[in-house]
């Protein structure tokens, strides 16, 4: 499994609530249509002044699957357009998963 990790800074004029509402609206509807998508998680950072406001993690079988999915023209344009409604900047990284704890023993 490969994770595509997006580190997101919100538009400065948005409150935390507005940021989350815009992110989880139409943008997520485009993301749900990405071919080969195995999972999508959004995390909103807490604290007084975190370096990022949110982290998005999408999961695919391979990096090639992720790159193909984000290259679908209609989806890429829709994701870009809706992202611009909540994000001032986004940094994207790929990470391979190495599970070290998968279930806590009692």
Q: Language-model features: where?
A:
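Macromolecular interaction modules
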Residues: 1-106
């Amino acid at each position: 499994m490969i994770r595509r990790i997006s580190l997101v800074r919100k538009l400065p004029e948005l409150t935390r609530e507005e940021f989350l509402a815009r992110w989880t609206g139409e943008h997520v509807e485009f993301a749900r249509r990405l071919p080969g998508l195995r999972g999508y998680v959004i995390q909103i950072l807490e604290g007084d002044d975190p370096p990022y406001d949110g982290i998005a993690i999408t999961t695919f079988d391979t990096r090639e699957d992720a790159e193909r999915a984000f290259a679908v023209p209609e989806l890429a344009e829709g994701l870009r357009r809706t992202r611009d409604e909540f994000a001032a900047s986004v940094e994207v990284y790929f990470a391979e998963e190495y599970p070290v704890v998968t279930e806590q023993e009692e």
